[in-house]
UniProtKB/Swiss-Prot annotation:
Reaction catalyzed: 1-(5-phospho-beta-D-ribosyl)-5-[(5-phospho-beta-D-ribosylamino)methylideneamino]imidazole-4-carboxamide = 5-[(5-phospho-1-deoxy-D-ribulos-1-ylimino)methylamino]-1-(5-phospho-beta-D-ribosyl)imidazole-4-carboxamide
Main location: cytoplasm
Pathway, per record: Amino-acid biosynthesis; L-histidine biosynthesis; L-histidine from 5-phospho-alpha-D-ribose 1-diphosphate: step 4/9
Name used for this protein in its record: 1-(5-phosphoribosyl)-5-[(5-phosphoribosylamino)methylideneamino] imidazole-4-carboxamide isomerase
Superkingdom of the source species: Eukaryota
One GO term describing the cellular component: nucleus
Organism classification: Eukaryota, Fungi, Dikarya, Ascomycota, Taphrinomycotina
Organism name: Schizosaccharomyces pombe (strain 972 / ATCC 24843) (Fission yeast)
Amino acid sequence: MEKSQHTLFRPCIDIHQGQVKQIVGGTLGNDADVKTNYVSLKPSSYYAELYKLNHLEGAHVIMLGPNCEEAAKTALHTWPGALQIGGGINISNAQNWLQEGASKVIVTSWLFPDAQFDLDRLKAISSKIGKDRLVVDVSCRRKDNRWFAAINKWQVMTAFELNEENLDLLSQYCSEFLIHAADVEGLCKGIDEDLVIKLGEWVKIPTTYAGGGRSIEDLDLVDKLSKGKVDLTIGSALDIFGGVLEFTRVVAWNRRFTPLPLQD
């Protein structure tokens, strides 16, 4: 289905130490220092089922460190062929995750050995699994009004700049971008508006922005700033993750632009 030119809400399931959590992204470097907004008492399958029941396509499951694989598989098995998986993905395990039921795999740090972007790695994994099954996560940090890819739990800033030329290059080998603004991720203090504007100008494939989203107004803002070309993930602000924004409201937002599928 062709992407409608409206920003949609894109859900997430973030897994840390085997549990569904919402964390402050910039604090992920050391487990002892991780700032946690929310730890769910519910299994990953609860969220996968919730997204399935509400026809929320394109959710991403992110494994934040070790001991997350079983919880990730549980989510994928709950809604096979519908959830994307990221966190530690490389050319050796990507096919396995697709076989476990992921719709697409999300690759990040593996593309940056020694913090240097490796185009040959991108070409290789794209060739192996197909660009239609590959999402590139170019999560970033801001420096002097420019944005650079950040890897290894967003702690290492690379020299790979987010700009139209580089995103055009990446888009030859993948079908989608996921972009976490690591400086504002999990803070619920608003989005990086400048980055969203730039992404709206640069991207030519489906793109999801995550970082700082906290309200329905932010969905409307991203829609306007990106001219509907960038979707928005909201995590910590949602009531299903201990926040105040009602999940039913983001579902209703999507229904305005994506009618429910016909029932059999």
